[in-house]
């Protein structure tokens, strides 16, 4: 799917710990925790963890926006994330 496309392209260009890989990983965790919270609405520790993950992903995307705008746009469009600015 989209993550496989990102993974294959980023492995050819960058290392596994690249910003793009981290954003993909965090996005997968966000989706998983969001689904968990739909079932368990009062799981406040998961809500707090989700906010922390979203903050980290936002910081990474801000860094990517400043460093390489074309990669930023590609990641945003591939993952279906709203743009920061």
UniProtKB/Swiss-Prot annotation:
One of its GO terms (biological process) is translation. It comes from the Eukaryota. Its main location: plastid. GO terms for molecular function: structural constituent of ribosome. One of its GO terms (cellular component) is ribonucleoprotein complex. The keyword Plastid applies. Keywords: Chloroplast, Plastid, Ribonucleoprotein, Ribosomal protein. It holds the Pfam family Ribosomal_S15. The keyword RNA-binding does not apply. Gene3D superfamilies: S15/NS1, RNA-binding. It is found in: Plastid, Chloroplast. Belongs to the universal ribosomal protein uS15 family. Part of the 30S ribosomal subunit. HAMAP family: Ribosomal_uS15_B (MF_01343_B). NCBIfam families: S15_bact (TIGR00952). This is Small ribosomal subunit protein uS15c. It comes from Chaetosphaeridium globosum (Charophycean green alga).
């Amino acid at each position: 799917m989209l993550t496989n496309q990102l993974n294959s392209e980023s492995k050819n260009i960058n290392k596994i710990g690249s910003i793009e890989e981290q954003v993909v990983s965090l996005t997968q965790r966000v989706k998983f925790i969001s689904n968990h919270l739909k079932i368990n609405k009062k799981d406040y520790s998961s809500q707090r963890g989700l906010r922390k993950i979203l903050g980290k992903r936002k910081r990474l995307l801000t860094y990517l926006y400043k460093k390489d705008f074309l990669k930023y746009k590609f990641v945003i469009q591939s993952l279906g994330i709203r743009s920061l600015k």
